[in-house]
Amino acid sequence: KTRLRDAMGIHSARRGYSKDGAYGEKDRESGRSMAIKYDDSALKTQLQPIARVHPETGRIALYVSPGYTLGIEGWPQDESEEMMMYLFQHQARPEFVYSHRWSTDMLLMWDNRCLIHAATGGYEGHRRLLHRITIAERC
């Protein structure tokens, strides 16, 4: 915890949204239902604190994601990769995971500032309708 308190994560959308990323041309050819446009801007990187304080609760949350966090600024690559793998495994431990079972007319809300989310299926054979609303503070 002490070592990560002021550490900055190197974030990029390249793993998902670059031409060769998970949602790039090969994924599109495989029949993905959503039209995702890849872009070279996905190759850019941005630094973000690894440990962030939630502005409402004051609680500290990890801000790392296997899809977006490439490493830790200023750390040797091997140490950075080892720590990233540890953090990814830590945040996916069963006591931190909520899995939802959908039913008709259900509404689910979450706070992206303190969790990661993923669609893991479970709706095969059913119509999937998603309305996304993003609420943000003005900067």
Which residues make up each language-model segment?
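Non-heme Fe(II) oxygenase catalytic core, chiefly the N-lobe of the double-stranded beta-helix
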Residues: 1-107, 112-139
